[in-house]
Amino acid sequence: MAEVLEKVTKIIVDRLGVEESKVTLEASFKDDLGADSLDVVELVMELEDEFGVEISDDDAANINTVGDAVKYIEENA
């Protein structure tokens, strides 16, 4: 999990320009990290590329926190 979280954190920091300390498993992309819907779509696309997974629109709609993203990747990559 640590390696996945580390990579996800780097992508979020690079994409959203937030401090690494704000990226926690409980952090909401929209509420805590300031992402808008376009940011979330771009994050999902970058996660797909980085981890070699395909995230369906339905699944992407349920990825609201950093922890959701990490869990999805661990279960599907």
Swiss-Prot record:
Gene3D superfamilies: ACP-like (1.10.1200.10)
Record PTM text: 4'-phosphopantetheine is transferred from CoA to a specific serine of apo-ACP by AcpS. This modification is essential for activity because fatty acids are bound in thioester linkage to the sulfhydryl of the prosthetic group.
Main location class: cytoplasm
Pathway: Lipid metabolism; fatty acid biosynthesis
Annotated GO CC locations: cytosol; membrane
Residues with O-(pantetheine 4'-phosphoryl)serine modification: 37
GO molecular function, one term: acyl binding
A Pfam family per the record: PP-binding
An individual GO BP term: lipid A biosynthetic process
Purpose: Carrier of the growing fatty acid chain in fatty acid biosynthesis.
Protein name (record): Acyl carrier protein
Source organism of the structure: Listeria welshimeri serovar 6b (strain ATCC 35897 / DSM 20650 / CCUG 15529 / CIP 8149 / NCTC 11857 / SLCC 5334 / V8)
